[in-house]
Amino acid sequence: MSPLPDLNKQTPIAVVAAGRLGSSMAIALTEAGYKVAAISSRQMSHREWLASRLKETLVVENAQTAANVASVVFITSPDAMIEDICSEIDWRSHQAVIHCAGVLPLSVLDRARVMGAETAGFHPLQTFPSSDSSTQLKNVSFATESLNPALFYWLWILATDLGGSAFKIESSQRAAYHASAVMACGLLAGLTGLAAEMWKPLGIDRDDALKKLIPLLRATIDALDEKGLPSAITGPYVRGDVETIEAHLEATSDNSEETFEAYRALAGASLHIAKE
């Protein structure tokens, strides 16, 4: 285990392959008083935008150039690119290399580890609709992993300074954790899309239906936050309303096979929670 320099807010940080997540993190880090020394992006238009937002930060195209000026490097590319980006950079001892993926193990950073750097994972449990989503990091949980105690502790404090909180995760737990996140985010959006498509027989298109469903979704999220489970679960399955359930199954079947299967599977799979 290579010794790291003292890690604090003045430790020079680089954010490599900055898209929506990396850009939002770089802005949030700067706003929290951390020293973002460099940030890289392959897109010229995005580099120009970053330069306008991060006036004290070196904005470059090349990831190696960014990594050269930093003691801590966050790789914030899409998951499939992280290992390749890590393998293309010449790392040095006393550096910390951190990926921000939810599902990937620390082993994708083995190239950096072999070259003497310390490695970690730091995944914000959040979605980022744009590159200017730094406020999305507040009140967020960060899945944090590192075999280096000093680096782990620094990331723990960093999560707090960003307005969130950290929790410990191991590489073997990441697939289950990330599947949970996708169920609560991407698949929830997909489920809402299926629900919105059921309004077509009413003469209401999906976009219009979505607007009408949003208040219901917000109320459900509020109930989950305020009352928790199982209290937030409502509907005919909780009441034991068999006739309504039968009508729903017929209606979803008439709509599409996908809608029918989703309704039946979700109702059945969540029944044990509703029964608590």
Predicted regions span which residues?
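Rossmann-like NAD(P)(H) cofactor-binding subdomain of soluble oxidoreductases
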Residues: 25, 44, 48, 52-54, ...
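NAD(P)+-binding Rossmann beta1-loop-alpha1 motif at the extreme N-terminus of oxidoreductases
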Residues: 1-65
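Nucleotide donor/acceptor-binding cores
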Residues: 9-11, 95, 140
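Interdomain hinge/lid region at the active-site interface
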Residues: 218-276
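Hydrophobic Val/Ile/Leu positions in short beta-strands of Rossmann-like dinucleotide-binding domains
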Residues: 14-15, 75, 144
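Internal alpha-helical scaffold of NAD(P)-dependent oxidoreductase catalytic cores
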Residues: 25, 49-53, 111-112, 116, ...
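Short alpha-helical
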Residues: 20, 45-46, 80-81, 104, ...
